[in-house]
Structures are given as C-alpha cells and as structure tokens.
Amino acid sequence: MEERKSKRGKIGLTVFLLVDLLLIGAAVYMIAARQRDIPTGAPLGGTAASVLDSVPEETVPAATEPDVPAPLELADEIECGYAYVVNASDGLVLAEKNGEERMYPASMTKLMTLLLACESGIEPDEPFTFDQDMLDPLIERGASRVGFEDGETVTFGDLLYGSVLPSGGDATAALAIMIDGDEQTFANHMNRKAQALGMFDTHFSNASGLHAEDHYSTARDIALLLQETLKHDLCRTVLTAPVYTTSRTSQHPNGLELYSVVDQRMAGFLPQHIVFQGGKTGFTDYAGYCLASFAEQEGTTYIVVVAGGEEKETPCRDAQTLYELLCGVPEQNVGEQ
C-alpha cells in the first residue's frame, strides 16, 4: 500500500514538472514569435534599420551627378580679349574667353554704383548741389561728365540717369557722396557688396572706373554684377532708357538732354532674332573698349560682357556676334565656374 502511494507521488511530480516545462517553453516561443512579428523600422528606442541594409551592395544604385556641358571656349570668334556670356534667367554660362582673368573694368564699374544707389532708399527727388572742388579732379583726369556745374542743384534721379546714359563721372561722384558721405567710404561699400555677390576677383577704388592699379575685375564678375542689377526694376529702367532730360536749373534752364551711349554705339550692330535692351560701356587706355549688355529672347534674358577691345566698335561687333551664337551653345552653371 505504501509502495503504491509512493509510485503515485512520483508520477504526479513528474507530470507536474512536465506541465511546467511545457508552459515555460510555450512562453518562450510566444515571446520569440512576437519579436519576429515586429515590423522593420519600428521605433524601439534605437535607430531603425534601413531597407537598404538588407540589399547587397552591388544592387544599390550609386548617386550620379547630371552631366553639365562646359561653356563654349571662345577664340577667334571675337576680337576682345575677355568675354562672358550668361543666361541671366537661370545663371548658366554659355560661352567665355579669359572670363576669370583680371582686367580693368573702366566705366562698367558704374553698374555697381547704380546698384548701390538703387538699394540706398534715397528718394528720386532728393536734391544734391555740386561744387567746384568735386568737379576739378574729374576735369583734370579727363573723366566723362554729364556737364553739371558748380552750384547746380539736381535730383538723385538725375544722377542715376546721368551716371549711366552719358556715363557721367560727375554724377557717380555725387551719388557716392549722397550715399556714404565721400567716395573712399563708398568704394569700401562697393567692395563689401562685391564680396557678398561672389565677385571674388574684383576690387574697386572709385565710383566711376577711373584707372587705378587696385581697381580691377573679371568678365565673370561683371556678368554677376549685371545679373544682380537687373533684379531691381529701377536699375533696369535706367539701363534701358534711350533718353532722359534732367531737372531745369538756373545753369541749364531747359535741363540737359542725355542720350544712351550704349544705344548710339550698338545702332549699327543690333543682333538678329533677339531684342537688345541696354547696358553699360567703358573705356580707359588701360582697359580698352568694354561693354556689359543684355538682350531678351522669348522671355529669357541673356548677358554679354566683352572687354579689352582695341576700337570703339569692337565690343559692339563682338556682342552682336555672341548674341547671334546663343542658340545651341552648351550651358554650365555660373556658380560652378
């Protein structure tokens, strides 16, 4: 009897242990199954694995840069020593010749003067009075002038058009004084703006472009400058004006009638199939003849900068050639130059 009870006890203990083992195994299985069922990328307090981690390396496509054609390298197509052609609408470079080599910009400098003037917030009817002390240095150096006289009071608007249409050094000197108090301070302002625009091979020492060893730029930088200038409606209005009459003064009772030098120069060189808009000429003995201009075709604006021409007509002829070469010219982003 006792032996039978002992056997039953052993069997019961064995069954109990087996049941416990089965329960523990089932629990382990369920936990493992739940872990397997967790979707990839679920937030578990760590970094979710990427789907690409499970893809063999050779099957993951490598990122590729889009092919960007180099700009057309100009040579005998033009006579000027420097050139840069840009699509102003998207900043793509179409063609260039020594575009990043330093040269003297002459009166193309006045584009920066115009830009800073238009950004100054000075009202167009703000008056300015000339004196002989500021005019004498310009006369001595043979700078181009509007013709304003000692004691003559004109407006800020008169100075804007006077600096561009006839390329008046008297107008740019006056703008520098109105904006920054004196021309040297204004030149520093010009240089800060140049750096901000990415004109890293440019340095200005005056507002008009009179020759100085430390007054230089590149065709590329001038193209960047003109591109920025065209973003301002007032700048564009001044650059495209064919004629302007200054305020009536006691020195000039009927005002001074100013005509666009660019329009006069380009009259015999207007390109086909594109509408020439305007720009800025330049000349010194060191710079040669220069022209920064822009034209439009089907809503797209193109910029052509040419410099270092030997004759007055040279940059105009080259600009005509380049505008007519625009169709089919490969493009490259100006920021990658």
List each model region and its residues.
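Catalytic-site microenvironment of enzymes
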Residues: 10-11, 16, 87, 94, ...
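Hydrophobic membrane-insertion alpha-helices, especially the h-region
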Residues: 15-28
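Active-site-adjacent loops and short helices of periplasmic peptidoglycan-processing enzymes
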Residues: 37-220, 229-230, 297
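Penicillin-recognizing serine hydrolase domain
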Residues: 13, 34, 39-45, 68-82, ...
